[in-house]
């Protein structure tokens, strides 16, 4: 029986528009019970999220996971900081990148892998407004060539 590829839950489409993605890295997320249930129900928003390194630990900040519908008084806070599960050397490398000017560490995708929630984080450099215009112009030219010549 063929298994689905990575069970994509959420994708940050705005990230590729706002950043040049230099490299990617897979990390686990430390979640509570109601959070994983909400993620499985696809009630997560990555748009404004980022990764912050604090005291040798990586945290996923400003990612909204909606409260679980059937949750009771023990439901989670939707915008709480969530610890990322990474090796020390990966955290040290990300801390060096975070210290550089103009570099950001952002979540790109959340997916399930063997039943566990994983986040694909990307190291990105912010785009300027003219870079965004050039990207749109190039995409339109490629579409026109494809439409005209069927390449």
UniProtKB/Swiss-Prot annotation:
Any one biological process term the GO annotation gives: trans-translation
Family label: Belongs to the SmpB family.
Gene it is expressed from: smpB
Family annotation (CDD domains): SmpB
Gene Ontology cellular component terms for the protein in this record: cytosol
Pfam families: SmpB
Location of region: Disordered: 132-151
PANTHER family in UniProt: SSRA-BINDING PROTEIN, TMRNA-BINDING COMPONENT OF TRANS-TRANSLATION TAGGING COMPLEX
Chief location of this protein within or outside the cell: cytoplasm
Official protein name in the record: SsrA-binding protein
């Amino acid at each position: 029986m063929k298994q689905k590829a990575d069970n994509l839950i959420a994708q940050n489409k705005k990230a590729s528009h706002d950043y040049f993605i230099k490299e990617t890295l897979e990390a686990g997320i430390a979640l509570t019970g109601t959070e994983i249930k909400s993620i499985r129900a696809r009630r997560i928003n990555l748009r404004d999220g980022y990764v912050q390194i604090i005291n040798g630990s990586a945290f996923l900040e400003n990612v909204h996971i909606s409260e679980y519908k059937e949750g009771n008084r023990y439901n989670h806070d939707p915008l709480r900081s969530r610890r990322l599960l990474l090796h020390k050397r990966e955290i040290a490398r990300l801390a060096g990148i975070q210290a550089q000017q103009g570099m950001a560490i952002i979540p790109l995708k959340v997916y399930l892998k063997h039943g566990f929630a994983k986040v694909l984080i990307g190291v990105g450099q912010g785009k300027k407004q003219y870079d965004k215009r050039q990207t749109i112009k190039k995409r339109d030219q490629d579409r026109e060539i494809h439409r005209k010549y069927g390449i």
